[in-house]
């Protein structure tokens, strides 16, 4: 069982047939967001799909709340700068327990590109999702359908590796 979760969100553009639409003003994308929490091997332990206007913090808490029963061994949650704030930390502690530590991975002050240790694991998981053509853009009418296709993509990945 994992003791560290790495959390991130990905904005995905909608097609014209998509039912749920939102706008992510930060990335200027009209579509949905996928929120995932992965272990150190990149396998998902909490997944949520929301409209794009939902903040990263709210979506991560939604994913952790949905999968709370499977996250009893978590001791730390590693996030990027989009998850800074006392309300998120409090929400994680209420959902996963007071012993859980929220760690924010800080960027370099010079704003140069640098790979932040352990953060690349969640980005690699998003890259694995992008290998599935159906997940390049959101064309589903319901968010739950999109969520199930994310689950199927990770399931297919695990089955290919075993």
Regions picked out by a protein language model, each given a short descriptive name:
Residues 1-98, 103, 107, 153-154:
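Polybasic low-complexity intrinsically disordered regions
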Residues 90-93, 97-98, 112-162:
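Basic, amphipathic alpha-helical segments enriched in Lys/Arg and hydrophobic/aromatic residues
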